[in-house]
C-alpha cells in the first residue's frame, strides 16, 4: 500500500500484532528517526536496548538503518508486545516497499505472526490451568 502525501513523499505502511498489541507503521524516506505515538522511540520504549533492537531489527538486516523515518501508532498490551508488533509491521512495510526484501525477512522470521495469546481462565480453576489443591482424604 503506497500512497502520496501532501509534500509528495512516498509512504509505505504495514500493520503488526502481538498478544493484544497493535502497531500501525509508516515508513517515509528520511534520516532514520523512530517516532512512536508522537514520542521519540527511545523515550517511549524506556531507553531499553532490547526493545530498540527488536524494533529496528528488520532495517538492520537489510542495511537500511538511517534511510527511513518510522512513524508508529501503537495501542494495547505492554512494551514487549508493542516492540514485537512494531517489528512485524516494519517488516511488512519493507516488503511492500521492495518485494525482493521478502525472502531475506522471511528467512529471519520477521514476517511470521506470533499467534500465542493469553489463555482464558476457566470456571472451577484459579487461573487458566491452575486447579485448587486436591485432598484425597
Curated annotation (Swiss-Prot):
It holds the Pfam family Ribosomal_S9. HAMAP family: Ribosomal_uS9_B. InterPro entries: Ribosomal_Su5_D2-typ_SF, Ribosomal_uS9, Ribosomal_uS9_bac/plastid, Ribosomal_uS9_CS, Ribsml_uS5_D2-typ_fold_subgr. It is found in: Plastid, Chloroplast. GO terms for cellular component: chloroplast; small ribosomal subunit. Keywords: Chloroplast, Plastid, Ribonucleoprotein, Ribosomal protein. GO terms for molecular function: RNA binding; structural constituent of ribosome. One of its GO terms (biological process) is translation. Belongs to the universal ribosomal protein uS9 family. It comes from Gracilaria tenuistipitata var. liui. This is Small ribosomal subunit protein uS9c.
Amino acid at each position: 500500500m503506497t500512497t502520496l502525501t501532501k509534500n509528495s513523499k512516498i509512504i509505505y505502511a504495514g500493520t503488526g500484532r502481538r498478544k493484544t498489541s497493535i502497531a500501525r507503521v509508516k515508513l517515509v524516506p528520511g534520516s532514520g528517526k523512530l517516532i512512536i505515538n508522537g514520542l521519540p522511540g527511545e523515550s517511549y520504549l524506556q531507553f531499553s536496548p532490547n526493545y530498540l533492537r527488536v524494533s529496528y531489527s528488520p532495517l538492520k538486516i537489510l542495511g537500511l538503518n538511517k534511510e527511513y523515518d518510522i512513524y508508529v501508532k501503537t495501542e494495547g498490551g505492554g512494551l514487549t508486545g508493542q516492540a514485537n508488533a512494531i517489528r512485524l509491521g516494519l517488516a511488512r512495510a519493507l516488503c511492500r516497499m521492495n518485494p525482493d526484501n521478502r525472502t531475506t525477512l522471511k528467512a529471519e522470521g520477521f514476517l511470521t505472526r506470533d499467534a500465542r495469546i493469553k489463555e482464558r481462565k476457566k470456571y472451577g480453576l484459579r487461573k487458566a490451568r491452575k486447579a485448587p489443591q486436591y485432598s484425597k482424604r
